[in-house]
Amino acid sequence: MVAQKSVSNATFKNKEKPQEVRRANIVAARAVADAIRTSLGPKGMDKMIKTSRGEIIISNDGHTILKQMAILHPVAKMLVDVSAAQDSEAGDGTTSVVILTGALLGAADRLLNKGIHPTIIAESFQKAARRSVETLLEICHPVSLDDREDLIRAASTSLSSKIVSQYSSFLSPLAVDAVLSITEKDSKTVDLNDIRLVKKVGGTIGDTEMVDGVVLTQTVVKTAGGPTMKEKAKIGLIQFQISPPKPDTENNIVVSDYRQMDKILKEERAYLLNICKKIKKAKCNVLLIQKSILRDAVNDLALHFLAKLGIMVIKDIEREEIEFLSKSLGCKPISDVELFTEDRLGSADLVEEIDSDGTKIVKFSGVKGVNAKPTVSVIIRGANSMILDETERSLHDALCVIRCLVKERGLIAGGGAPEIEISRRLERESRSMEGVEAYIWQEFAQALEVIPTTLAENAGLNSIKVITELRSRHENGDVNEGISVRRSGTTNTYEEHILQPVLVSTSAITLASECVKSILRIDDITFSR
């Protein structure tokens, strides 16, 4: 009898463990979602993060906050990955996707407590998500890239929740112009790497400007009296050093008398002069030199020779900038002086050093060439590095919104209107279903209301009253009825110009449901040796 009892006990324990693991996973993931819930919407709060290196970051961008948080639980890290996926797919809605995932996990937890199998929940959630995406595409308004006003409104909605919201009327057109200037008419893709964001401390955010072409923060080298402006520029981008070669660290050169020393100096002069002559022979008159950590990228004697030959020199080009510069200027990086030929050079009408709000920058105007791609530089201004970083992130989000509209040319009303409409339609469709699936769809529909509820709470409104009012308006056919923080209540958000790309919402719902499916299918966590 005793043996039989212990067997049944063991079986009971085994059944209990997966439920405990699942519950612990859901609690961990929801804790992450709750941590950033207050940062959603125009009245959302910012988070101050102190990194391990002592840097201070102030942001309300969901992906930035989660990326910097010290998260230990492996399932909680999945929410960070979901936020990163939303950032790369849509660029905006990184907070919404995490909050939505947390709400769906809460719904799943309630369903698990009712004894419904996790696989059935996960699959029904996926079906409901697919139906939600179909609904979003039905209610979205088509948009043309020629309709500049609609694009600006969509960018303004994205910027309204950021620190830079007061400058949204200025930054939104800038973001639209930047994306459209690098996008072909019928293209469905935009490479945001073709837009270079350059940060400069000084001035205010209102001094931010867009430059059609290339801007470098490095200044022209003037120590040897070289030129600071070149018309009809032929631009060379080199990755080798114009300085005497050094021996290896293990080797030494011993000089016993002054004649040998004189010979070494003569050799150095001849070596450097030979390199400079080869550069001049290829008709290059503007030289960009990559930063080197092994030895001087260019020494004073070489600068003297280059100045005498009338070549403008800009040194300390970062390795990360090489690809952008070669693409923008149409020049190929040159790793050896023997490969320095005219066909590898880029060309521009004018290269000059200009004074921009008290700081010097190098501007390339009228870039032309077979290999040159259209690129844009945006010079971001701000009082300190924290404001600059947050402005860069905000502007990146606005650029991503316009990129979304190039990919999927549809706009939907913001302010929680689409979520309420999907919720209403799913609930209506669930009534015609049979069995457990109807119950799961109802929970999914209720979970979607977390977005308008959070927007209302963060704006200091009575969320229950607002959601009830929205539901009744949507029942009467007002599909664009959402929350307006400006009006402190409900309004037709489409007419109020609170707009967002349909891709942001479709991507958020799809990613959230996939993440929930992954979490629900985990029934144990083991640690490898």
From Swiss-Prot:
The alphabetized UniProt keywords are: ATP-binding, Chaperone, Cytoplasm, Nucleotide-binding
Q: Which Pfam families match?
A: Cpn60_TCP1 (PF00118)
Q: What compartments host this protein?
A: Cytoplasm
Please give the superkingdom of this protein's source: Eukaryota
Question: Does this entry carry the keyword Disulfide bond?
Answer: no
**Which InterPro entries does this one have?**
Chap_CCT_delta, Chaperone_TCP-1, Chaperonin_TCP-1_CS, Cpn60/GroEL/TCP-1, GroEL-like_apical_dom_sf, GROEL-like_equatorial_sf, TCP-1-like_intermed_sf, TCP-1_chaperonin
Gene Ontology BP annotations = chaperone mediated protein folding independent of cofactor
GO molecular function terms attached to this record:
ATP binding; ATP hydrolysis activity; ATP-dependent protein folding chaperone; unfolded protein binding
Q: Which CDD domains match?
A: TCP1_delta (cd03338)
UniProt-listed Gene3D superfamilies = GroEL, GroEL-like equatorial domain, TCP-1-like chaperonin intermediate domain
In the UniProt record, does the keyword ATP-binding occur? yes
Q: State the GO CC annotations.
A: chaperonin-containing T-complex
Q: By its UniProt entry, which PROSITE patterns does this protein fall under?
A: TCP1_1, TCP1_2, TCP1_3
Q: Which family does it belong to?
A: Belongs to the TCP-1 chaperonin family.
Q: What is the role of the protein in this entry?
A: Molecular chaperone; assists the folding of proteins upon ATP hydrolysis. Known to play a role, in vitro, in the folding of actin and tubulin.
NCBIfam families assigned = chap_CCT_delta, thermosome_alpha, thermosome_beta
- Assembly, per entry: Heterooligomeric complex of about 850 to 900 kDa that forms two stacked rings, 12 to 16 nm in diameter.
Its protein name is T-complex protein 1 subunit delta
This protein's encoding gene: CCT4
